[in-house]
Curated annotation (Swiss-Prot):
Belongs to the serpin family. It comes from the Eukaryota. The lineage of its organism: Eukaryota, Viridiplantae, Streptophyta, Embryophyta, Tracheophyta. This is Probable non-inhibitory serpin-Z9. CDD domains: serpinP_plants (cd02043). Residues 12-44 are annotated as: Disordered. InterPro entries: Serpin_CS, Serpin_dom, Serpin_fam, Serpin_sf, Serpin_sf_1, Serpin_sf_2. PROSITE patterns: SERPIN. The record marks 403-404 as: Reactive bond. GO terms for cellular component: extracellular space. The reactive center loop (RCL) extends out from the body of the protein and directs binding to the target protease. The protease cleaves the serpin at the reactive site within the RCL, establishing a covalent linkage between the carboxyl group of the serpin reactive site and the serine hydroxyl of the protease. The resulting inactive serpin-protease complex is highly stable. Residues 389-413 are annotated as: RCL. It comes from Oryza sativa subsp. japonica (Rice).
Length: 439
């Protein structure tokens, strides 16, 4: 099968404009006789709504529910998920799907009724998120970002060159093959090696050993790494060892960064929220971390229940007023890896995982190797918040400096999100239960 016509036409670009003189000089062969005019093809569908509106719909319909399920199932460890990265991978899968399979994927992604316009919305959101939000521009002084996404089929399949081009050109991802049937034990190493190369070593594994077997169909994968420097890091007071109180009543000694600054800050019933902006590079993007800190040491899960059960809760409780705040935040690193297949099924995405799935636009028309379906949807999130990221600087407090009006000490479990402010894309959601854990 071929890539759907509306995507194929979007990819097709003639090497020269019709009648270009340079084109005529490249060949001495006589010009072919004009053919009878073909029936005019309808133009490819345009997105049904502006990308910002489509992105907001996707975050409400897909990203928030997925993040809620992942974090609720994370157990007693730190966890983070980049739902937009998973969204990009599934949008890529939709680009290679047909019929009911495509409709179901698009509906799960929050892209309308799953028709051609919905497919254009999904492609538009995914393409802009990858190219505008997740692309690394750390050389200009902004945060370090590394995204890798792709789909892998068995080596026996004949991938459509048009779909391979679609994956790279539109979704910033890859469509590749690995030998699932004959060398399933080697396939994870092959895929992990590609992820490591694509992220320049910031993400070293995506597939754990034993993930692949001889019956594996398609594997979708996405990984995102983030590390930034706080804005105004020269205002840093000090880094000290302090206690962090865990949910089980124990405590751990970890490094805390302490400083005071005027920041967007809000006090709500039973929790506080602070916005910590990252240093901006020489582009329009602006990243910030928002920390939601419950008043009670064991209040995190009650808070996250509200966050994920009310679609507008986060937006309605973001801080809007600035305040001079004494800030104390622990260093932490999260490296969290998970197969989100079961969460997607719980969200109604079932057909793509059945042998009846139709991903025929991923392969050539002469591929007769049998059913093509999703086996796994793997995701990994890696982010670092530590003294290296903020470039610790020794600064004296100074006499006569005003005391902060509020204090924000994140010394017990909290929820956080990292948002790109210009587009409104929430690239990470997560929670910290024990900052001494480095996985």
């Amino acid at each position: 099968m071929q890539v759907s016509s509306y995507l194929r036409r979007a990819l097709r670009r003639p090497p020269f404009p019709a009648g270009d003189a340079n084109h005529r000089r490249l060949s001495s062969a006589p010009a072919p006789k004009p053919e009878a005019p073909a029936e005019a093809m309808p133009p490819p569908p345009m997105p049904t709504r502006p990308w910002g509106e489509a992105l907001a719909a996707a975050q409400r319909a897909f990203c928030l529910p997925l993040a809620g399920r992942v974090l609720a199932a994370a157990g007693t460890g730190n966890a983070a998920v980049s739902a937009p990265a998973v969204h990009v991978s599934l949008a890529l899968a939709a680009g290679g799907a047909r019929g009911a399979t495509r409709r179901q994927v698009l509906q799960a992604l929050g892209c309308g009724g799953g028709g051609r316009g919905g497919a254009a919305d999904a492609a538009n959101v995914a393409s802009r998120v990858v190219k505008r939000v997740l692309r690394d521009r750390s050389t200009s002084g902004g945060p370090r970002l590394a995204f890798a996404g792709g789909v892998w089929a068995d080596a026996s399949r004949s991938l459509s060159p048009e779909f391979v081009g679609l994956a790279g050109n539109v979704y910033g991802s890859a469509a590749k093959k690995a030998d699932f049937k004959n060398k399933p034990e080697d396939a994870p190493d092959q895929i992990n090696s590609w992820v490591k190369d694509s992220t320049k070593g910031t993400v070293t594994t995506l597939l754990p050993a034993g993930t692949i077997d001889q019956n594996t169909g398609l594997v979708l994968g996405s990984a995102l790494y983030f590390r930034g420097r706080w804005l105004d890091r020269d205002d840093l007071r000090r880094t000290t060892e302090q206690k962090f109180y865990c949910l089980d009543g124990t405590s751990v000694e970890v490094p805390f960064v302490e400083y005071d600054r005027t920041r967007l800050f809000a006090v709500h019933d039973n929790f506080k929220v602070i916005k910590l902006p990252y240093k901006q590079g020489k582009n329009e993007r602006k990243f910030s971390m928002y920390i939601f800190l419950p008043d009670d040491h064991d209040g995190l899960f009650e808070l996250t229940q509200k966050i994920f059960s009310e679609p507008m809760f986060l937006e309605q409780h973001l801080p809007t007023e600035k305040c001079h705040v004494g800030i104390s935040v622990p260093n932490f690193k999260i490296s969290f890896q998970i197969d989100v297949k079961d969460f997607l099924k719980d969200m109604g995405l079932e057909l793509p995982f059945l042998r009846e799935a139709e991903f025929s636009d991923m392969i050539k028309e002469d591929d007769s190797s049998g059913p093509l379906f999703l086996s796994d949807v793997l995701h990994k999130a890696v982010l670092e918040v530590d003294q290296k990221g903020i470039e610790e600087t020794s600064v004296s407090m100074g006499l006569g400096k005003p005391l902060p009006a509020q204090h924000f000490k994140a010394d017990h479990p909290f929820f956080f999100m990292i948002r790109e402010e210009v587009s409104g894309t929430v690239i990470f959601m997560g929670h910290v239960l024990d900052p001494s854990s480095r996985t």
